[in-house]
Amino acid sequence: RYWFADPFLFERDGITYLFFEAFDLVECKGKEAYSILCEDGTWSSLKVIIDEKYHLSFPNIFEYGGKMYIMPEMSEDYSLKLYEAVSFPDEWKITQDILSDVYACDSVFIEKEGVQYLLTNEMYHNVPNGQYASCWVKNYLYPMKGLKVTGDGVKVADGDYGIRNAGKTFISDSKLYRIGQDCRERLYGRGMVLFEITSLNPYKEKKVKNWSCEEIAKHIRSNHHGKIIGSHTYNFSEHYEVIDFSSFQTLSRRIEILRKWHNTKRNIYRILGFVKRCCY
């Protein structure tokens, strides 16, 4: 009934949670769901936790001020809302409207040295050069305080190469990084691009590395026969990293836990390779 995408990991009290989009093939829309890593290495049955009348994806989960939040993608509603856990991880409520009248997708929360920003991708209604709306986007940076937007957004980039977010931002060796999607050739998630954010005000970033689907496929253990045609979300936690992919063989989307990390002080991240011990 479902295929899966947009995985986010969260570890709490010794339990590893995997939050993801569960696309319901019967209802033709995405829902937010989670699964728990069991002691034998398997995953519990999925549980849907947020189901709206419109499509949901990219369940960006994070902790702030001792509370748990999810900031999903809900572009079909032309809004961006923040959900707060009433009873983690099963019960959630809308706690505020972050943005309205926006065609926004895959938004990430940035906090560095006490300063907060929202970096969101806004899709075009009239896409240039025959591109797909999901591929060609504009990046807007909004100032925030206490998880509330405090000013107008500033467009910082647009295009199809690395502009659309592909996971959370993270800090490594005091450097702030963003991972984006390579959507060139009118292909959604053709690869991934890593950027270092060198300045937030004004916003500046520089490309560090990029990976094609073929390169990403080398790190995925599932029996995909090298026929991966898309990968567009990558995240990690203290002990795990996770990635989604679609394959030509099955025309389905899957989530892959790449490896469990036993020594977190190594250069541990298989996809990011050179990046040392990281945190959000």
Where does each model-flagged region fall?
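Carbohydrate-active catalytic/glycan-binding domains of CAZyme proteins
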Residues: 1-280
